[in-house]
């Protein structure tokens, strides 16, 4: 079972991803977070294999959250979800240890395959 945390400041995106990913028997969405601070709090309480991380979030953005997650939990994989594919924020997150990125709007099949692949 792959334990997934969804981090996005838009509730609709968080809940939609949770519902869709919940249809896969090998994925367990163990939590959602609205910002990077909530991501770090979740990781203190739960074991997470893969984080789906938005880049632009309040309080602690996806870049700095990626840096902190990889420093404290180096085995946790991070897939960046973004609306921009040439964004400097994305490249910064990749430098800090994100496993890859996907554009928002990607098919759910591609998202599922990415989660399985990085895990």
Question: What would you call each of these model-derived segments?
Answer:
Residues 35-38, 59-64:
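Acidic catalytic/metal-coordinating carboxylates
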Residues 11-31:
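Two-component/phosphorelay signaling modules centered on CheY-like receiver
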Residues 8, 54, 82:
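Active-site residues of response regulator receiver
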Residues 13, 53, 58:
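The feature encodes the CheY-like receiver
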Residues 41-42, 63-75:
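Short amphipathic alpha-helix used as the core "switch/output" element in two-component signaling
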Residues 88, 106-119:
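C-terminal output helix
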Residues 46-52:
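Active-site beta3 strand of CheY-like receiver
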């Amino acid at each position: 079972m792959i334990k997934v945390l969804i981090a996005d400041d838009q509730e609709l995106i968080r809940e939609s991803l949770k519902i869709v990913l919940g249809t896969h028997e090998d994925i367990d969405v163990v939590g959602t977070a609205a910002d990077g601070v909530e991501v770090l709090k979740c990781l203190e309480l739960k074991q997470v294999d893969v984080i789906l991380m938005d880049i632009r979030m309040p309080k602690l953005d996806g870049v700095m959250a990626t840096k902190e997650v990889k420093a404290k939990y180096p085995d946790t994989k991070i897939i960046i979800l973004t609306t921009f594919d040439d964004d400097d924020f994305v490249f910064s997150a990749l430098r800090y240890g994100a496993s890859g990125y996907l554009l928002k709007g990607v098919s759910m099949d591609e998202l599922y395959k990415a989660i399985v692949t990085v895990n």
